[in-house]
Every structure is written in C-alpha cells, then in structure tokens.
UniProtKB/Swiss-Prot annotation:
Record function comment: Cytokine with a wide variety of biological functions in immunity, tissue regeneration, and metabolism. Binds to IL6R, then the complex associates to the signaling subunit IL6ST/gp130 to trigger the intracellular IL6-signaling pathway. The interaction with the membrane-bound IL6R and IL6ST stimulates 'classic signaling', whereas the binding of IL6 and soluble IL6R to IL6ST stimulates 'trans-signaling'. Alternatively, 'cluster signaling' occurs when membrane-bound IL6:IL6R complexes on transmitter cells activate IL6ST receptors on neighboring receiver cells. IL6 is a potent inducer of the acute phase response. Rapid production of IL6 contributes to host defense during infection and tissue injury, but excessive IL6 synthesis is involved in disease pathology. In the innate immune response, is synthesized by myeloid cells, such as macrophages and dendritic cells, upon recognition of pathogens through toll-like receptors (TLRs) at the site of infection or tissue injury. In the adaptive immune response, is required for the differentiation of B cells into immunoglobulin-secreting cells.
Span of the signal peptide: 1-20
Disulfide bonds: C67-C73, C96-C106
GO CC annotations, alphabetized: extracellular space; interleukin-6 receptor complex
Gene: IL6
Assembly behavior: Component of a hexamer of two molecules each of IL6, IL6R and IL6ST; first binds to IL6R to associate with the signaling subunit IL6ST. Interacts with IL6R (via the N-terminal ectodomain); this interaction may be affected by IL6R-binding with SORL1, hence decreasing IL6 cis signaling. Interacts with SORL1 (via the N-terminal ectodomain); this interaction leads to IL6 internalization and lysosomal degradation. May form a trimeric complex with the soluble SORL1 ectodomain and soluble IL6R receptor; this interaction might stabilize circulating IL6, hence promoting IL6 trans signaling.
Name this protein carries in UniProt: Interleukin-6
Entry keyword Secreted: yes
Keyword set, alphabetical order: Acute phase, Cytokine, Disulfide bond, Growth factor, Phosphoprotein, Secreted, Signal
Intracellular or extracellular location(s): Secreted
SUPFAM superfamilies: 4-helical cytokines
PROSITE patterns in the cross-refs: INTERLEUKIN_6
Keyword Secreted tagged: yes
Amino acid sequence: MNSLSTSAFSLGLLLVMATAFPTPGPLAGDSKDDATSNSLPLTSANKVEELIKYILGKISALRKEMCDKFNKCEDSKEALAENNLHLPKLEGKDGCFQSGFNQETCLTRITTGLVEFQLHLNILQNNYEGDKENVKSVHMSTKILVQMLKSKVKNQDEVTTPDPTTDASLQAILQSQDECVKHTTIHLILRSLEDFLQFSLRAVRIM
C-alpha cells in the first residue's frame, strides 16, 4: 500500500467516524425520544457493523499470512500463552448475549475490551514481521471503533484503561528471541481479537 492509498484509507475511516452518529435530538421534553435513546440509531449500527466486518477481514488476512509464512496455525501451546496474556473475552455477565442482554453493560464491556486490545495491537504493530500495513489498518480501525462505541456509553468513566504492567509483559514476550513463542503470541492476539469482534458484531445487531 503506497502513501497515497494509506492516506485515502485513513481519511475514509475518519469520515466514517465523523458521521457514525447523527446529531443528538433534544435532551429533554420528548418522551418518545427518551424511550428510544438507549438504542443505536439504524445508520449508526450499520456503520459500526461495517467497520467491524472490515477489521475482521484484515485480521483474517493476517492470520492466513501467519499460517502460510510462519507456519503458525492452531497450536497446543496457545492454551499456555492464553493464560499468561489474559486477553479480553465476552462472558455472560457482560450483557452481550441474547439471554440477559443489557445494552449499556455490553457497550461498556466491548469498548473496554477493545481499549485493551489497542494496547496489544500497538505493540504487535512494532514487532510484526509480515504485512505491517494490514496491522496498521487493524490498529487504526479498532481505535476508531472504540471512539464510535464510547460516544454511545452513558457513563464513560466505566470504560477502564489497561493495567500498565500488561504493556511491559507483552513487550517482553514479543521481543523474545524464541520465535515460536513470539509467533504463537501474535497468532493468539489476532485469534482472540477476531473472536471478540465476532461476538461484538452479534451484539451490535440486536442493539
């Protein structure tokens, strides 16, 4: 991807973010508006859905590259790596599933989880040996997705930031001289983010 196409991509994503949510209506005095204010507007939900699909496509390409170029497909060592990384997951208590769905709780958890993944993607971007443009695209798109979703969270203080020690721990793993550990960690991050986004996509569709 040349600099011109990269700039065009960045501009396109920023435009998506800028138009993701319509101008807010009256803050009070309209009971009908109050009744529907908890739901994502149709156009907003569509834009969020399309952005998630875009990110999933890029992740799929990166995972294929990991498999083809580094022979890093499914691996039994991932179970150990997963325990060490504590990557974000969506669980029943997060209110994102059909049973027990809670939009505010779900939006907060998805946004917080993506903020955590941003940290991993930032470090991954600096250590990935394959298609760095795809990694940059995933990182940038995820950042925009966070902003789109966070704007709909009522109590934004509930969106927590990652523990700084996570940064140092992951950095140490990815700078390891053990290529197998490094590639397994990258593969796991991509796979976990893919799973997280797939569950998020289902949740967005019922908001």
